[in-house]
Amino acid sequence: MCIVAQNNYQQAEEYFMQENFSKAKPIFDSYLKQHPGDKKTREYLGDIAAYGKNWDTAISYYKALVQDEETNANYHFKYGGAMGLKAMSISRIRAFTYIGDIKYELERAAKLDTKHIEARWALVEFYIQLPGIFGGSENKANDYANELGKISKVDGYLANGYIAEYTDRPKDAERYYKKAIEVGGSPHTYEKLSSLYEKNNQPKEAIATTSESLKKHKRNQLNYQIGKISAQYNLEPEYGIECLSQYLADYSIKDGVRKDWAYYRLAQIYKNLGKKEIALTWINKALLDQTDFKEAQKEKSLILAL
């Protein structure tokens, strides 16, 4: 029986790693009934609840874990993080009652683990987003961003870029994100810079940045991103069509953006080019599998009006 139970548990962990939580949860629930004090299982169940945005359930698991092991930084981080995410989902008046506990748990996590990156990132976001009257502080956000920089230069640059972007200093944000690319060069660093350019109405720079990332990382999702920018800003249509065609040719569910969105972007580009019939072909394809695709319905009306 022990071997069978162990095999079942390992299977649940595999499901968890695959994010197949509907299969993992019943096995963990069953195991917890037999081993009610097992911290690892309770953490798994808390994580599954958090993934499903069942904040009260997640908070309940993490709070109990913190009480059982007060010196575990990760438990404090998850407890504080779950409360923070719940606070974002409720009214402001109710959310303010969580501020003290969120701050305590995240700062406790950072103090217990001097290299806990996620806790420091959460504190950067906490202090920069919270109004000053309730304890928000750009200086404290900067302090935690600088702590991140000592642990990971890339995270430090990204955090400082995030603060600059949030406080409407796009030139400073651009400088920090470029440094993050220079030091790290991960897809995420390119994505942050490209997103900044999009927000500040710099589509040429956004396409150039995403194109550079595509050449380096060969991620198919970047083909879609280039096509999206091309469609939205009526920019480099041939390149946009090429990238969207490549996206569809290499598509897998892991790419994250459904095919009908690529069809929609192709329709937009052809509409921008004044090619009504081709645009209609693509927009009808977008609506074929998803008839309630509101953006595509609106786009079709614009195409028909050409």
Predicted regions and their residues:
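Alpha-helical adaptor scaffolds
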Residues: 13, 125, 191, 195-199, ...
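Residue at a conserved register position within TPR or TPR-like alpha-solenoid repeats
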Residues: 15, 49, 83, 90, ...
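Short coil/linker segments at helix-helix boundaries
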Residues: 15, 53-67, 71-115, 121-147, ...
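Short coil turns that delineate tetratricopeptide repeat
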Residues: 36, 70, 114, 151-153, ...
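Canonical tetratricopeptide repeat
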Residues: 40, 44-45, 78-81, 122, ...
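TPR alpha-solenoid repeat register
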Residues: 41, 75, 119, 156-158, ...
